[in-house]
Amino acid sequence: CSGLSTCALMKLSQDLHRFNSYPRTNVGAGTP
């Protein structure tokens, strides 16, 4: 990671994608 902010953002993004994987919200499942 080049910067802490970038690292945190990337981790957050991964977590968000993980949550989107679950059939919790149709909106999340619709977006790649």
UniProtKB/Swiss-Prot annotation:
The keyword Signal does not apply. The modification Proline amide is found at residue 32. Disulfide bonds join 1-7. Coiled coil: none annotated. SMART domains: CALCITONIN. It is found in: Secreted. InterPro entries: Calcitonin (IPR021118), Calcitonin_peptide-like (IPR001693). It comes from the Eukaryota. GO terms for cellular component: extracellular region. GO terms for molecular function: hormone activity. Keywords: Amidation, Disulfide bond, Hormone, Secreted. Belongs to the calcitonin family. Causes a rapid but short-lived drop in the level of calcium and phosphate in blood by promoting the incorporation of those ions in the bones. This is Calcitonin.
